Amino acid sequence: MDHHLLEIIACPICNGKLHFDKKNLELICQTDELAYPISNGIPVLLESHARDLSSLEKK
């Protein structure tokens, strides 16, 4: 994931910072406890496509 892109995109719900999860190829919003998928290198920042973080991932 391009570090410059991570600096300019934000969570569509809270406008908070997103963190790249390299293992799962997702962008994580810790504030809303959501993970957004990356499909073919493109972040899918739609709430309907996000998944809730598990209790282990929230730590």
From Swiss-Prot:
One GO CC annotation: cytosol
Residue stretches in coiled coil: none
Stored SUPFAM superfamilies: Trm112p-like
InterPro entries per record: Trm112-like
Gene3D superfamilies the record matches: 2.20.25.10
Listed PANTHER family: PROTEIN PREY, MITOCHONDRIAL (PTHR33505:SF4), ZGC:162634 (PTHR33505)
Family membership: Belongs to the UPF0434 family.
Protein name: UPF0434 protein HDEF_0234
UniProt source species: Hamiltonella defensa subsp. Acyrthosiphon pisum (strain 5AT)
